[in-house]
A protein has these predicted regions:
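Core catalytic alpha/beta fold that binds nucleotide/phospho-ligands
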Residues: 1-223
Length: 223
C-alpha cells in the first residue's frame, strides 16, 4: 500500500460568514487540504509532476460511469479520491500513488436490534471481528461494514454489482491501534467483476471516537 492522506471537516462547520458548511463545500475544502499534503510530500510514486501555487492546474473531481471519483488536473488524470459521511463529519481520502481508494465510516448505533446480520456478514468473518471488538456485536458490525463498504468503493462498483456477503473479509493484522484486513471477492462476485480476480485488496481500519474509519486500497498492477 502506498501513502494515503485523509482528513475530515464537521458536517455543520461554521464558515467565517456564519453560514453552515454544506456537504459540497466541505468536499471542495477537503480536496484542497489533501492536495496540498500530497504536493508537499513530492511523492515519487505519482508518475507526473504535482503542480501547486501559481503553476497549479485547475483541479476537478470527476467520476467514472459507476460513480468512482478521481481528480482531474487540467486535462490530466490525477489520483483517486473517496468521500464519506459519518459521525457528524465529511471525510475524504486521497491516494498518493496509482492505486484506487475507498473510504467509509460506520457507527455502532446503526447495527442494533433486528439488523439483518446474516444477510450482510458471513459467520466466520463476523465471529473474528466480534473477538476483536471484545464481544460487542454492534461495534464489530460497524467495523466489518465499513471494511466492506470501503472495499467496494475502491473497486468502483459499490454494491451495484456485488452483495455484501460476496465481500470476504479475512483475519486482520493488528498494529499501532489499527487493523489491516485482506479482502477477497467471492466466485459469484468475480463473475460480475472479473477485473477483481486475484487483485490485491487491503483495508486499513482505525477507531474514531464512536465510529470506525476504514480505507481500502486496490492496486490493479498487483495480483
Amino acid at each position: 500500500m502506498g501513502p494515503v492522506f485523509y482528513t475530515s471537516l464537521p458536517r455543520d462547520a461554521q464558515t467565517p460568514q456564519g453560514h453552515g458548511t454544506s456537504g459540497g463545500a466541505a468536499r471542495r475544502r477537503l480536496v484542497s487540504i489533501l492536495w496540498e499534503r500530497l504536493v508537499a510530500m513530492d511523492s515519487p510514486l505519482w508518475p507526473c509532476r504535482l503542480p501547486s501555487g501559481r503553476d497549479a492546474l485547475p483541479i476537478q473531481v470527476v467520476r467514472d460511469p459507476l460513480g468512482k471519483p478521481h481528480l482531474l488536473l487540467g486535462e490530466y488524470r490525477g489520483p483517486a479520491i473517496s468521500f464519506t459521511q459519518g459521525g457528524g463529519a465529511v471525510w475524504a481520502a486521497l491516494c498518493g500513488d496509482e492505486s484506487d481508494i475507498g473510504i467509509d465510516v460506520a457507527e455502532a448505533d446503526e447495527f442494533q436490534g433486528d439488523y439483518p446480520f446474516g444477510r450482510v456478514f458471513n459467520a466466520r468473518e463476523l465471529q473474528h471481528v466480534v473477538s476483536l471488538a471484545g464481544g460487542d456485536v454492534g461495534k464489530a458490525s460497524a467495523l466489518l461494514w465499513s471494511v466492506k463498504e470501503a472495499a467496494v468503493k475502491a473497486l468502483g462498483c459499490g454494491f451495484h454489482l456485488v452483495e455484501p456477503r460476496d465481500i470476504h473479509v479475512h483475519p486482520a493484522v493488528m498494529g499501532d491501534g489499527e487493523y489491516t484486513f485482506p479482502v477477497r471477492l467471492s466466485r459469484k462476485a468475480l463473475e460480475r467483476l472479473p477485473l477483481g480476480a486475484g487483485r490485491s485488496i487491503w483495508v486499513r481500519s482505525l477507531p474514531q471516537a464512536k465510529t470506525w474509519l476504514s480505507i481500502a486500497f486496490v492496486n490493479w498492477q498487483c495480483r
